[in-house]
Amino acid sequence: QPDFDARSMKSSILYQMGKLEESEKLTQRCLYEEIRNAGLSLVSLAKIAGEESEYEKAFRFLDAAQELETLFEESRLGGVNVMVSQMKLGILVKQGKKDQALSELKHLVMGYLNIVQGRKTETPIYFDKLEWNESTSPKRGYLLENLLWLLETEDVYAELRAEDVYREMVEKIQKELEKSR
């Protein structure tokens, strides 16, 4: 199996043929997928490091995933930032850093709400030739239901449930869910 994406070669050929728009669209699609995959790989490496109780290493992977997303302005598309925030929250709880965990919980819930509320931003120049539609974005109600389920059922969040901040964030999620029904 080749260690490169054949679409990159096709894009180069399209460019040489003078089909610039087609080449640009294909190159942007490849870039988007590579960035997304790199972010997901960093998150996976962070999960492994977290399971091995190598929390500093996990945070470095998660920070790199966020930096990648920030660099390419991909967060408007719902990329990995919420996954990173969720993982950081879990690690902070395991480390007994309750105040930092509650702060991360706020960040996590606001990230989900931004996605669900569909806050529009300008399309990043890296992806301005790509078309976005409902099939390329996750179902909004499902995201909130999933987050609420995780917060209410995962053992790692148990010690946060008695906190006011936790209850406020759960209420925000529930209110947004009611609006979406």
Task: Label the predicted regions.
Residues 1-42:
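Solenoidal tandem-repeat scaffolds enriched in leucines and small polar residues
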Residues 35, 39-181:
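Alpha-helical protein-protein interaction modules
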